[in-house]
From Swiss-Prot:
Subcellular location: Nucleus; Chromosome, Centromere, Kinetochore
Region of interest (Disordered), residue spans: 1-25, 46-73
InterPro entries: Kinetochore_Ndc80, Ndc80_CH, Ndc80_sf
Domain of life: Eukaryota
Main location, first listed in the record: nucleus
Coiled coil location: 263-399, 484-560
Family classification: Belongs to the NDC80/HEC1 family.
GO molecular function, one term: kinetochore adaptor activity
Subunit structure: Component of the NDC80 complex, which consists of ndc80, nuf2, spc24 and spc25. Component of the NMS super complex which consists of mis12, mis13, mis14, ndc80, nnf1, nuf2, sos7, spc7, spc24 and spc25.
Protein's name in the database: Kinetochore protein ndc80
Organism classification: Eukaryota, Fungi, Dikarya, Ascomycota, Taphrinomycotina
GO cellular component: chromosome, centromeric region; condensed chromosome, centromeric region; kinetochore; Ndc80 complex; nucleus; outer kinetochore
Pfam families on file: Ndc80_HEC (PF03801), NDC80_loop (PF24487)
GO biological process, one term: spindle attachment to meiosis I kinetochore
Native species: Schizosaccharomyces pombe (strain 972 / ATCC 24843)
Length: 624
């Protein structure tokens, strides 16, 4: 029992059957005791608390260490436990979502439990064995230590497994179906310990959560919800009225007026604080609404931003394609411009030559025959010129068609280059830092100014390297096939072992059936023998009655004979009972051994299944 003058008490966070909650606030550094949920006797009339929930009540009681347990004492070990666990709600079975079968999760839970036990001052030493699987006695000590952190007044009885079940019901442990009395007796079993470890981890988490909740400090205004201030005012009022009563003063109403004024002032302050809190609450609600609207607007803007980013990527890709096409068209236009300039220069030369010839012709004396000859030559030249013009138009058309074919070839080449780069990236030779690139740059790029229009020598450099990569990939594929075959053989071996274990399990079950039938036969035989003994005893009693009626002289002899027969019957019945108990013990021992063996087989099958699943996952990842 702690001293009542301590400044801060630890709340007992265990649930209580009482719904009464008392609250006190410290005033001027005075010591305060923690609240009690147990029924208490009031010394004076209780006033209603100013708690906003309207569920608290303040009771003037002597200073003492309260508890969350009811004020009842334990009368016997098995009758009742003096704590809050007298009434508990019904707990429906819930499937445990925690991965208790995972060894890593078990290690984490065990580490947290052991660390908390060391921090909380657990008296017994904790070794490596306690981290994973303590004994039954050690588990009982650990659970008592943890539960006393929640309810210091609870006392455990001789049979701790019943107390553990009752305490877990009181704590509303959601997975109570996994914690039975038979499991609590066999703590060291591998199939039992994960559920027990999960329960201990849950209790430790509950204790840590409640300790954090108790450690929270709530600041309260000095003149608002201060019960000690009210106590002081009431005490001053009682002292003044008592002195006035002793002095027989006529001013008996003056303390009442001051008391009323004090409470009115306190109520006014509380009203002002309430109004201020209401206005603050409304402002916060408005801020929350504006923040929610802002969040919705932000979400819309984020969606638009993501859409614009996607459009930007598409636009950049389109712009890059257009840029490459513009560059190719620009180069083609430059070539055509050069050709046009050459043709214009040739045309200028021809014009100059024509002018010179015309000048020569005009300065010459030409006869009619020569003129006719010149006219015919001119006509011939015109015809030749027209033929040359038609040929030039045909050549221009052919050049245009050739340009279209060249552009189509360039587009096809660009697509093939992109396809090559994507395939090279998939097989791991692009970029330079890829796995199979060997620090070589095999990324194709179109170079219109180069001799081969691309930046790499496909025949002498790229193709031999790709053939080498293909050979290496083929070798890796064959190696993976060999590994897959080995894994398949291992899986077949595991399946055969599982089949053998299943056959062995069926044999054990058949032997168990035969043992049970033999047990039933022994039970029937024992009952028949007992009936025979009972019939013989009845027969002897009837003979005794007949002997009593026939002869009074042989009474002593018959009495001695009856006593000897009764002693013999008791000995036979006792021997039969011992034989029956021995048979029951042997059958129970055989059943226990069979059950342990079956559980061991199940655990082995689960381990084999996990190994098989792990191998299968590794194989799948390797194939991917």
């Amino acid at each position: 029992m702690q001293d009542s003058s301590s400044y801060a008490r630890r709340y007992s966070q265990a649930p209580s059957s009482s719904n009464l909650r008392t609250t006190t606030f410290g005033f001027n550094g005075l010591g305060t005791s923690r609240t009690s949920l147990a029924p208490q006797r009031t010394l004076v009339n209780a006033r209603q608390s100013i708690d906003p929930d309207g569920l608290s009540s303040r009771v003037l009681t002597p200073t003492m260490r309260p508890s969350l347990a009811p004020n009842t004492r334990r009368s016997s070990v098995r009758v009742s436990n003096a704590s809050f666990i007298s009434q508990t709600p019904n707990i429906t079975s819930i499937k445990d979502p925690r991965p208790l079968s995972d060894r890593r999760y078990q290690q984490e839970c065990a580490t947290q439990v052991v660390n908390y036990l060391l921090e909380s001052g657990f008296s017994q030493p904790l070794g490596l064995n306690n981290r994973f699987m303590p004994s039954t006695r050690e588990f009982a000590a650990i659970f008592k230590h943890l539960y006393n952190k929640l309810d210091p007044n609870f006392r455990f009885g001789a049979r701790y497994e019943e107390d553990v079940t009752t305490c877990l019901k009181a704590l509303n442990y959601p997975f109570l179906d996994s914690i039975s009395r038979s499991r609590l007796v066999a703590i060291g079993s591998p199939h039992v310990w994960p559920a027990i470890l999960g329960m201990l981890h849950w209790v430790v988490s509950l204790i840590q959560c409640t300790e954090k909740a108790v450690a929270m400090v709530y600041t309260v205004e000095q003149n608002s919800l201060d019960d000690h201030l009210v106590d002081k005012v009431l005490f001053d009022y009682l002292v003044r009225t008592y002195h006035l009563y002793l002095d027989e003063s006529p001013e008996e109403s003056e303390p009442e007026k001051e008391l009323k004024a004090t409470f009115n002032q306190q109520n006014q302050d509380l009203y002002n604080q309430t109004e201020a809190l209401k206005s603050t609450n409304e402002e916060l609600i408005n801020q929350i609404k504006s923040a929610e609207e802002l969040d919705s607007a932000i979400q819309v803007l984020e969606e638009r931003y993501r859409t614009m980013q996607r459009d930007e990527v598409k636009f950049q890709s389109a712009m890059s394609g257009m840029k490459s096409k513009m560059e190719s068209r620009t180069n083609l236009m430059k070539q055509l411009q050069v050709n046009i300039e050459e043709k214009e220069s040739q045309l200028q030369l021809l014009k100059e030559k024509r002018d010179s010839l015309k000048y020569q012709v005009e300065n010459q004396d030409i006869s009619i025959s020569e003129f006719e000859k010149m006219v015919s030559e001119r006509e011939q030249l015109d015809r030749n010129l027209n033929m040359i013009g038609s040929k030039i138009s045909e050549l221009r058309k052919e050049v245009f068609d050739t340009d279209l074919l060249i552009q189509a070839s360039i587009d096809s080449l660009e697509k093939k280059v992109q396809k090559f780069n994507s395939l090279a990236y998939r097989i791991g030779i692009v970029p330079i830092a890829a796995i199979r690139s060997a620090n070589n740059d095999f990324e194709l790029e179109i170079n219109p100014e180069g001799p081969n229009y691309i930046n790499l020598d496909l025949k002498n450099k790229v193709r031999p390297f790709i053939n080498e990569v293909r050979r290496s990939i083929t070798l890796e594929f064959h190696e993976e096939q060999n590994k897959s075959l080995k894994l398949q053989e291992h899986v077949d071996t595991v399946n055969d072992l599982i089949a053998e274990l299943q056959d062995e399990l069926r044999g054990i079950e058949s032997r168990l059936t035969s043992v049970l039938s033999e047990c039933n036969m022994l039970r029937e035989t024992a009952s028949e023998e007992k009936n025979a003994f009972d019939a013989e005893s009845d027969k002897l009693e009837r003979e005794l009655q007949q002997l009593k009626l026939s002869s009074h002289n042989s009474m002593l002899q018959l009495d001695q004979r009856i006593q000897s027969i009764n002693i013999e019957a008791d000995q036979i019945a006792h021997a039969c009972m011992e034989y029956k108990n021995n048979i029951y013990k042997e059958v129970a021992f055989v059943l226990g051994e069979i059950i342990h063996f079956k559980l061991h087989v199940q655990d082995s099958l689960e381990d084999l299944k996990m190994d098989y699943q792990k191998e299968l996952d590794d194989l799948s990842r390797s194939e991917l």
